[in-house]
From Swiss-Prot:
Disruption of the gene: reported phenotype: Disruption of the ure1 gene cluster via a large in-frame deletion in this gene abrogates urease activity.
Family per record: Belongs to the metallo-dependent hydrolases superfamily. Urease alpha subunit family.
Catalytic activity: urea + 2 H2O + H(+) = hydrogencarbonate + 2 NH4(+)
Gene: ureC1
Names of required cofactors: Ni cation
Protein name: Urease subunit alpha 1
Residues where substrate binds: 221
Superkingdom of the source species: Bacteria
Binding of Ni(2+) 1, residues: 136, 138, 219, 362
Amino acid sequence: MPARISRATYAQMFGPTVGDKVRLADTDLIIEVERDLTTYGEEVKFGGGKVIRDGMGQSQLSRAEGAMDTVITNALILDHSGIYKADIGLLDGRIALIGKAGNPDTQPGISIIIGPGTEIIAGEGKIVTAGGIDTHVHFISPQQVDEALNAGITCMVGGGTGPAHGTLATTCTPGPWHIARLIQSFDGLPMNIGVFGKGNASLPGALEEMVRAGACGLKLHEDWGCTPAAIDNCLSVADHFDVQVAIHTDTLNEGGFVEDTLNAFKGRTIHSFHTEGAGGGHAPDIIRVCQYPNVLPASTNPTRPYTVNTIAEHLDMLMVCHHLSPAIPEDIAFAESRIRKETIAAEDILHDMGAFSIISSDSQAMGRVGEMIIRCWQTADKMKKQRGSLPDDRPGNDNYRARRYIAKYTINPAIAHGMAHEIGSVEVGKRADLVLWNPAFFGVKPDMVLLGGWIATAPMGDANGSIPTPQPMHTRPMFGSFGKALTNTSITFVSQAAMDEGLREKIGVDKQLVAVVNTRGGIGKHSMILNNAMPQMEVDPETYEVRADGELLTCEPVDVVPMAQRYFLF
């Protein structure tokens, strides 16, 4: 005879189910469970006196007979594709199945087999997301990887050589020698990583050798001369090798105006960095490029969201990052031309409209690598408070908005850089790069981060304690961050040309190399999931006012944001 229990009791035991609502951290964002792939009365749970025991929820089947390596039980999945409850089966470091786990000999409707060789991660009451992807990383210090991983980032794409002045300002690794050294260093870093080569050249030869040396993309930056000739040449090389181009355009409009840059694109796909302009780009109207079908517009977290401190913070950051001198009036003018409250305010709204598609960090070069996810959700919360529910949201939840914002740092950067066949979503067949969150700490401090199906980092107490929880409790590297487990659970993204030339053997790295694919004409703004709006943009050159489809885009800065100081008292 079936038993009945209250929703509260059920949620406490097995996590929320259809119709239950969950608040994300201390924001005003509420998600609601849309569907539940588990079976009421047949839920699996690990523990003393619980279901996953021999002959009950655990079968006799071996790995060779279909049992999983790991099962995450009763997880609430938050993904661009939906918000739903399920068990997740992991095999060979990938997501093998999403559905109902258990013992097919004793339970009905089992698609995910638990056997004696299966580890269990308790997902009850936890939110599971795909690992974050940060596509704007200045590789200034290797310690960034620790900060990013501990914040829920599992893939970093960018360039640099360390604290060299070229790297402090620009996100690119110049030349095959530097690219080889950087890729070799990745064998010691628990992170999926891709490298941008320098894209600033008017002839193809030097760019071609960087792509063959392992660059998974090319970066055009104004500090190296972002002229129409360099843009055209870089995109031509990218088209030939199927790698993405990222661009930071000409703030001073020396080599041309935004129209000249757009003409140099010639309709070819390009990833536009900090499209708002405070991070750099044609002043004051680079923001206009988000209206074009070939531009994949992104912005970085220094301006996310617009607060009372945003403007004041930026001037000093710019002076340091771009090797400027406060004693030179022209340097001051350069910095001030990039900081416009009108376009920063519009940036908030364009993200909420889905006209800006990607959020990234700009790590240690104005942005904070460990705050990319936080800043994304702070923006979503600010926009809900100021603009109300989105038209596509149903009464009582913010599911559509949540899916739109999580897409900005998961699936969309993966699509933009040809990595979506491996990462970017909670999807069968993809790498098990997953993050578990306690809802109260969502987006701020993960409960666990998996790389390639293996735990890489997690909160942990005193290692000499009798249990795992005695203070000091803080995030620490786990076994997935050491030895050959590290090189067998994370990958390096490179070009197909580098794969064809045997780069792994040539430079002697242990990590698996994976080629990026479909970065050019096969994708465009239409490919940016839930973030493909292309409004007609106008920027007043005198007042800097921004309009989309004739509507003035403006909002007030906030003086309080969620996911902030209350989470970082210790």
